[in-house]
Each structure stands twice: as C-alpha cells, then as structure tokens.
Swiss-Prot record:
Binds 1 Mg(2+) ion per subunit. It catalyses: riboflavin + CTP = CDP + FMN + H(+). Keywords: Flavoprotein, FMN, Kinase, Magnesium, Metal-binding, Nucleotide-binding, Transferase. Gene3D superfamilies: Riboflavin kinase-like. It is an enzyme of class 2 (transferase). CDP binds at residues 12-17, 103-106. This is Riboflavin kinase. HAMAP family: Riboflavin_kinase (MF_01285). FMN binds at residues 90, 98. Mg(2+) binds at residues 39, 41. Catalyzes the CTP-dependent phosphorylation of riboflavin (vitamin B2) to form flavin mononucleotide (FMN). It comes from Staphylothermus marinus (strain ATCC 43588 / DSM 3639 / JCM 9404 / F1).
Amino acid sequence: MPIKLKGKIVSGLGVGAKYVQLYRGVFNKYLGIDPYPGTLNIDIGQDFFIYTKKLKAKIIPPPRKGLGCVLAYPGILMGIKIYVIKPCITNHGRNILEIISDKNLRKTLNLKDNDIVEIIIYDEEDYSYI
C-alpha cells in the first residue's frame, strides 16, 4: 500500500549532481531511467524510515568500490514518476528525501525552496501499476 507524505522543498548540500552522475549507469540499469544530474530535496520533518517499514525498496549496488548502496523507492510527485533515494552513506538527515527523475524537477514543476509538496511512495513491486 502506498504512503503519502507532505514536505517542504529545501536546498541540498550541493553534491547531488556529482553523485547522480557517479550512479547514473546503475540507476539506468536497475531503475530504467536516465536521471537528471541532481536531486530535489524534500524535508518531511520526521524520520523517513518510520514510514517505509512496510515498503520494499529496490537495492541499487554501488557502481564501484568506496561507494555505498542506495535504497530506491518509486513514487509520484505532482504527476511525475520519481524515485526517492536513500544512500547508505549520506550527510543528509533521515528527514530529507532525495528525489531523482529523468527531469529537472525544480524547473519542470516550478518549485522553489519552502514550497510544500505531497509525494506518494510505492513498494517497488507495485510501481509497475502506475
């Protein structure tokens, strides 16, 4: 069963583009998307993993030694298919959702810091029905 979360758009740490580029090949292989080089960050104000205990993530292996795996949860943000990614090694708190898509979400959806958005997150096995 999908979960719905609301959160606030926030600026990231400025390294999302670098890491999306590093993981681009494995995101393409395991998720079937060629991601935009960057992430959209959403602060949900609480620990994300409280909500995901009932959801199965897709585990993305690291593209090379020295990097960690990534948990990927499929979802929908304002009508656009996305993935919530939770890197196993990160400087973000558990309250921050990092979102990847094949689109520049800030530009496509005209989002600014402090905008409130709702995101629907699915079990990775249910995503094919969207």
